[in-house]
Amino acid sequence: MSEREVSTAPAGTDMPAAKKQKLSSDENSNPDLSGDENDDAVSIESGTNTERPDTPTNTPNAPGRKSWGKGKWKSKKCKYSFKCVNSLKEDHNQPLFGVQFNWHSKEGDPLVFATVGSNRVTLYECHSQGEIRLLQSYVDADADENFYTCAWTYDSNTSHPLLAVAGSRGIIRIINPITMQCIKHYVGHGNAINELKFHPRDPNLLLSVSKDHALRLWNIQTDTLVAIFGGVEGHRDEVLSADYDLLGEKIMSCGMDHSLKLWRINSKRMMNAIKESYDYNPNKTNRPFISQKIHFPDFSTRDIHRNYVDCVRWLGDLILSKSCENAIVCWKPGKMEDDIDKIKPSESNVTILGRFDYSQCDIWYMRFSMDFWQKMLALGNQVGKLYVWDLEVEDPHKAKCTTLTHHKCGAAIRQTSFSRDSSILIAVCDDASIWRWDRLR
């Protein structure tokens, strides 16, 4: 995306539609948008060139697994039902690793989502009657780039939507879909970036997690690197996922070292670093911004999973995390009665509250998602089946599940995303296919 031929568009909040972006000298071809649930738009070959190494061997009967039996989340009838209304396939035929709806749009605005895979970033708009309209497509100048993750935010001055993307080359790119330009990029990680997340309350604070074993916190308004989380007691292998809690005071990270680590960003040291990142002005000083190096997490455990931990999300003060063991585990640091904000780094207890069981999902880098209100949880497996759990239950053990299948969807579903109003669920697959499921009211 270094050389760019960009058609200019007036700055407004409506995204220019159906523009093909040449972010390189390559011809950018249009994703194949033919197809609905009844035609043959989707083939069922699984993509082979995933650029992700093999999953380590899964050991279902590993010692110590018995303690999990007490919290099995039996599937009962779920009150949510969905219908597959459309599918399409991007023409690069490479795995789509990430999908995200823009939750920052205003009510009444069209529902826009982005997909990432190969060296392509594509924006779509959902319309009634199942229509998915191509808005824009961006191609990286480097044919070897493989985007793994994307995250939406907005410009706090202009309110323009912004999309951050990153992948195998370890470069974060910020795209403004209104001006249709890649407006900034950040280089710092020594290897691939596996996940990007924006702070829930500050649209400028971007978290990135990497194959280089570290997490980085960036301020995209002042282009500063606020902090690096990793080192002495950090992750010992690739960091695969991380999430902010609802208030943006804590980060939970997880990775290939089987561990989950808690990092507080509401400490005096971190609050001060964030403030200083806003005050920093390179035009008024010769000194570079000093990033914090956080070597010690505020809590760490390897007692939840026995394999790569590839997805983690906060649910209130509880944690949802998964490995390639066919279960999402719900747990909390410390004992049941402990306050999460008073947990000490030396704490060795964890409390497992239950688990969501499913099947045929023992490859890694398969990520679950929740809707905006955290009432639904969705995960796809490696044979194209979608699981949706109803989280609105008093006892987590009673979480009900519905399974969504389509006879033409047979490739691994890498990620799912709900629209902000929960009316649409999008799933993206290893064969470059995109599936739209609409909720039946």
UniProtKB/Swiss-Prot annotation:
- Which region ranges are annotated with the description Interaction with EZH2? 81-441
Which SMART domains does the entry link to? WD40 (SM00320)
Q: What is the effect of changing R302S?
A: In COGIS; decreased trimethylation of 'Lys-27' of histone H3
Q: Where in the cell is it found?
A: Nucleus; Chromosome
Q: Which PROSITE patterns match?
A: WD_REPEATS_1, WD_REPEATS_2, WD_REPEATS_REGION
Cross-referenced Gene3D superfamilies, in alphabetical order?
YVTN repeat-like/Quinoprotein amine dehydrogenase
The record's disease note says:
Cohen-Gibson syndrome: An autosomal dominant overgrowth disorder characterized by accelerated osseous maturation, advanced bone age, skeletal abnormalities including flaring of the metaphyses of the long bones, large hands with long fingers and camptodactyly, scoliosis, cervical spine anomalies, dysmorphic facial features, and variable intellectual disability.
Q: What is this protein called?
A: Polycomb protein EED
